Swiss-Prot record:
Recorded family membership: Belongs to the universal ribosomal protein uL10 family.
CDD domains, per database record: Ribosomal_L10
Pfam family for this entry, one: Ribosomal_L10
Gene Ontology cellular component terms for the protein in this record: large ribosomal subunit
Keyword terms: Ribonucleoprotein, Ribosomal protein, RNA-binding, rRNA-binding
Protein name from the UniProt record: Large ribosomal subunit protein uL10
Taxonomic source organism: Streptococcus sanguinis (strain SK36)
Length: 166
């Protein structure tokens, strides 16, 4: 193999390792058997949620995982592998891929990594059941607003009682 090809592959390993280090979550799938139309729809959905989806050779993925400190992830790089990286939303890749897999039997989730820790297929599927980032933020906001709303209602009730008494 020529030195130019080796250098190019080394650059690719470095680039993938950097993506793995920077990613909030990584989901590895076996997309063998998806039609071109299904793959196009899947890629569009992932892109809409700012999730990067790539089919990368297993040898490159193994080396990149080792370089990124995710050595245990290397064991799932068997057979055709596609990888979804998300830097912002931890839940998005798992949720989109899991929802898509329900309608496309050919797509199989293999495992991944969450916040730099290797995750099994079961953990990725559990992550997929959580609401997305916006949903979690709205839940948090409603929990934070509830005490303030209750105090405001209590103050209003006291004011109404004083008006009625006067």
């Amino acid at each position: 193999m020529s030195e130019a090809i080796i250098a190019k592959k080394a650059e690719l390993v470095d680039a993938v390792a950097e993506k793995m280090k920077a990613a909030a979550s990584i989901v590895v799938v076996d997309a063998r058997g998806l039609t071109v139309e299904q793959d196009t729809v899947l890629r569009r959905e992932l892109r809409g949620s700012e999730v990067e989806y790539k089919v990368i050779k297993n040898s490159i993925l193994r080396r990149a995982a080792e370089k990124a400190g995710l050595e245990d992830l290397a064991s799932i790089f068997v057979g055709p592998s596609a990888v979804a990286f998300s830097n912002e939303d931890v839940v998005a890749p798992a949720k989109i891929l899991n929802d898509f897999a329900k309608n496309a039997d050919a797509l199989e989730i293999k495992g991944g990594a969450i916040e730099g820790a290797v995750a099994s297929k079961e953990e990725i599927l559990a992550l997929a059941t959580l609401p997305n980032r916006e949903g979690l933020l709205s839940m948090l906001l409603s929990v934070l607003q509830a005490p303030v709303r209750n105090v405001a209602l209590a103050v209003k009730a006291v004011a109404d009682n004083k008006e009625d008494a006067a």
